[in-house]
């Protein structure tokens, strides 16, 4: 008896949830949870790996050859200098672009999770009823399209170049473990579909 009570209390001790985390089923029980989830997506997008640097003034501008780093360069701009020199397989560049790719897909997954959950909830859960529910849904759909568009412009050529080749997947379900890559035209059609849907909802 003592052994079983020790084991059960040990099991409880091992299953402690950190104070800054919440289970999904708890998060999506309230309108406030949905607001927090959407704010979490915006927060992730503002990180250095995405729009806090790489997709605004960092990597994206280096790819466009906007900077002149020959005058002054330090450790924080090493990856940008490598990109300016077209050294795409350099370890500094690969680690930065891998992190960017991973965070972008994680943000898309979070959007899809919000979309999937908010659609099944009653509007009475939200302060503004349908207006707030639709705003959360519309923003998540629009963000999904926006992130896909940036991934497409980074990892695929212009639509007129190799129109039948596939480049990136378009992920609109959660969870998604394996997704087939699509052509540029297919991705653009899905981006436009999502943007139109988001506009009609909001």
Question: Residue ranges of each PLM-predicted region?
Answer:
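Membrane-proximal, proline-rich intrinsically disordered regions
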Residues: 9-61
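Short clusters of hydrophobic/aromatic residues that line enzyme substrate/ligand-binding pockets
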Residues: 14, 22, 27-28, 86-88, ...
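Solvent-exposed, polar/charged alpha-helical surfaces in well-ordered, non-transmembrane soluble domains
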Residues: 32, 36-39, 43, 109-112, ...
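Acidic helix-start/capping segments at beta-turn-to-alpha-helix junctions
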Residues: 58-67, 136
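Conserved, well-structured interaction surfaces
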Residues: 77-155, 177, 182, 197-202
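Alpha-helix N-cap/helix-start motif at coil-to-helix transitions, marked by capping-box chemistry
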Residues: 102-109, 164, 185, 189-192
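Short, flexible, mixed-charge acidic loops at enzyme active sites
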Residues: 158-171
């Amino acid at each position: 008896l003592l052994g079983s009570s020790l084991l059960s209390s040990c099991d409880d001790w091992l299953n402690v949830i950190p104070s800054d985390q919440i289970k999904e089923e708890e998060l999506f029980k309230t309108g406030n949870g949905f607001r927090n989830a959407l704010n979490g997506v915006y927060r992730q997008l503002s990180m250095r790996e995405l729009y806090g640097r790489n997709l605004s003034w960092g990597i994206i501008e280096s790819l466009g050859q906007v900077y002149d780093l020959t005058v002054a360069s330090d450790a924080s701009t090493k990856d940008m200098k490598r990109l300016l020199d077209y050294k795409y397989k350099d370890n500094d560049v690969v680690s930065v672009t891998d992190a960017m790719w991973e965070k972008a897909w994680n943000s898309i997954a979070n959007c899809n999770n919000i979309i999937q959950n908010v659609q099944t909830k009653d509007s009475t859960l939200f302060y503004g009823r349908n207006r707030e529910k639709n705003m959360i849904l519309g923003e998540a759909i629009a963000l999904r399209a926006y992130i896909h568009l940036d991934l497409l412009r980074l990892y695929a050529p212009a639509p007129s170049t190799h129109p039948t080749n596939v480049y990136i997947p378009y992920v609109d379900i959660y969870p998604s473990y394996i997704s087939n890559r699509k052509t540029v035209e297919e991705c653009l059609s899905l981006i436009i579909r999502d943007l139109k849907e988001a506009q009609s909802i909001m």
